[in-house]
Amino acid sequence: MEQAPEDQGPQREPHNEWTLELLEELKSEAVRHYPRPWLHDLGQHIYNTYGDTWEGVEAIIRTLQQLLFAHFRIGCQHSRIGITRQRRVRNGPSRS
């Protein structure tokens, strides 16, 4: 019969501590790109939905990651990640 593996001791860094550090990094990045009142309302919505739980922390992390990814991908003005907008230059007359 299979048995669950034994506890191999403490993790290198506690998961909760790592999660809170990630949340702080995302929050500090988000305030550089989004209005504070908007982020506050988002936080209130998450808090009203999940309360003061780890599920709420995970939800706000997931939401901020998605928002920042989309923001950078669409083309943040001070990011090198976004889509570059290039003008098309015609080489010669059109063959329509």
UniProtKB/Swiss-Prot annotation:
Q: Which UniProt keywords apply?
A: Activator, AIDS, Apoptosis, Cell cycle, Host G2/M cell cycle arrest by virus, Host nucleus, Host-virus interaction, Ion channel, Ion transport, Modulation of host cell cycle by virus, Phosphoprotein, Transcription, Transcription regulation, Transport, Viral penetration into host nucleus, Virion, Virus entry into host cell
Q: Which GO terms describe its cellular component?
A: host cell; host cell nucleus; host extracellular space; virion component
Name the gene that codes for it: vpr
InterPro entries found in the cross-reference section? RetroV_VpR/X
What's one GO BP annotation on this UniProt entry?
A: protein homooligomerization
Lipid biosynthesis as a keyword of this entry, yes or no, is no
Where in the cell is the protein located? Virion; Host nucleus; Host extracellular space
**One Pfam family per UniProt:** VPR
Identify its protein family. Belongs to the HIV-1 VPR protein family.
Any further remark recorded for this protein: HIV-1 lineages are divided in three main groups, M (for Major), O (for Outlier), and N (for New, or Non-M, Non-O). The vast majority of strains found worldwide belong to the group M. Group O seems to be endemic to and largely confined to Cameroon and neighboring countries in West Central Africa, where these viruses represent a small minority of HIV-1 strains. The group N is represented by a limited number of isolates from Cameroonian persons. The group M is further subdivided in 9 clades or subtypes (A to D, F to H, J and K).
Modified positions (Phosphoserine) are: S79, S94, S96
Q: What is this protein called?
A: Protein Vpr
Q: What is its main location?
A: virion
As for what it does, the entry says: During virus replication, may deplete host UNG protein, and incude G2-M cell cycle arrest. Acts by targeting specific host proteins for degradation by the 26S proteasome, through association with the cellular CUL4A-DDB1 E3 ligase complex by direct interaction with host VPRPB/DCAF-1. Cell cycle arrest reportedly occurs within hours of infection and is not blocked by antiviral agents, suggesting that it is initiated by the VPR carried into the virion. Additionally, VPR induces apoptosis in a cell cycle dependent manner suggesting that these two effects are mechanistically linked.
Instruction: Kindly give the HAMAP family that the UniProt entry links to this protein.
Output: HIV_VPR (MF_04080)
How does the annotation summarize its subunit structure?
Homooligomer, may form homodimer. Interacts with p6-gag region of the Pr55 Gag precursor protein through a (Leu-X-X)4 motif near the C-terminus of the P6gag protein. Interacts with host UNG. May interact with host RAD23A/HHR23A. Interacts with host VPRBP/DCAF1, leading to hijack the CUL4A-RBX1-DDB1-DCAF1/VPRBP complex, mediating ubiquitination of host proteins such as TERT and ZGPAT and arrest of the cell cycle in G2 phase.
Q: How is it modified after translation?
A: Phosphorylated on several residues by host. These phosphorylations regulate VPR activity for the nuclear import of the HIV-1 pre-integration complex.
Classification of source organism: Viruses, Riboviria, Pararnavirae, Artverviricota, Revtraviricetes
Superkingdom to which the source organism belongs: Viruses
